[in-house]
Each structure stands twice: as structure tokens, then as C-alpha cells.
Amino acid sequence: MINFEKVIPNKKQIKELYHLLTNRRYSISHQNLPSFEEHSKFVSKNPYLVWYLIYKNFELLGSTYIQKDNSVGIDLKLPNKEDVIEISSYIKKNHLPLKPVKSLRRGDFFVNISPFDKELIEIFKKLNQKEIQRSFLI
């Protein structure tokens, strides 16, 4: 069973989130690893609607968050179908997406995944989740 710890944030959580960041295999939002101080400032701003550290059997499994555009970030050390199902279910059971705003925000939760994260992409395909978008830098 997975346990979700809401990011407050405190020193322990900032360290664990930095550990996850330094070991992340794929990234969407940054090219270079921030310093611990930069990371600490970012986390302290509490930039997401909600952010959780995820534990399984008292071991840090990853993190998940919801942004103001209803996107859900999922960062797992070793993604697997069962954990993704449990995380998705927890998000949907405990949170409602923000109302849609035409041309700005969908009325549903959605997950952005790095195109290099083949494991997570395959998990969502096996779960018959609909792909709605591909993004390109210009």
C-alpha cells in the first residue's frame, strides 16, 4: 500500500525531493540540475496546488503534484502499473480538477510525460488512457 505525505514543505521533505530530482531519469521542465539552495527556494514557494511525497513500505517511491492547469506530475523511481493506478486513484478520489477555462485549462486531470520515459508511457497505454497532446519546443 502506498502512503501519501503532503509537502508542507519542511527540511526533510526538501531533502527527499532533491534526492528524487538528482536521481530523476527524465525531465520536462529543466535542462540543468539546480543547486540545493535553488531547489530549496523553489520548494519553499509551494508552487503546486498540492504536492505529495509517495512512500511504499516506508521507502521513498517518488512524488506527485497537481498544477493550476490540472496537469499531474508523477515522478517515480521505478514506475509500475500497480503504483500508477494507486496514485491516479488517490488523486481522483481526493481532489477535483479545477473548472475548465476555454483555451487555457481542461476540465480533467492529465499527465505530462517525457517522450523518453517509455516505461511510464507504456503503463498509461496499457491502462487505456487517451493520449491528448504532444508538445514541441520552437
Task: State the predicted function of each range.
Residues R25-K41:
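Conserved GNAT-fold acetyl-CoA-binding loop/helix
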Residues L49-G62, Q67:
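Conserved beta-hairpin
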Residues K130-I138:
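Conserved catalytic-core motifs of GNAT/GCN5-like acyltransferases
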Residues K102-I121, L137-I138:
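Conserved beta-strand-loop-alpha-helix junction that forms the acyl-donor binding cleft
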Residues F42-Y48:
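Short loop/turn motifs at secondary-structure junctions and domain boundaries
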Residues Q67-I87, N112-S114, R134:
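Conserved acetyl-CoA binding element of GNAT-fold acetyltransferases
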Residues I2-H19:
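A short beta-loop-alpha structural element at the N-terminal edge
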Residues N80-P100, K118-L127:
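Conserved acetyl-CoA-binding loop-helix of GNAT-fold acetyltransferases
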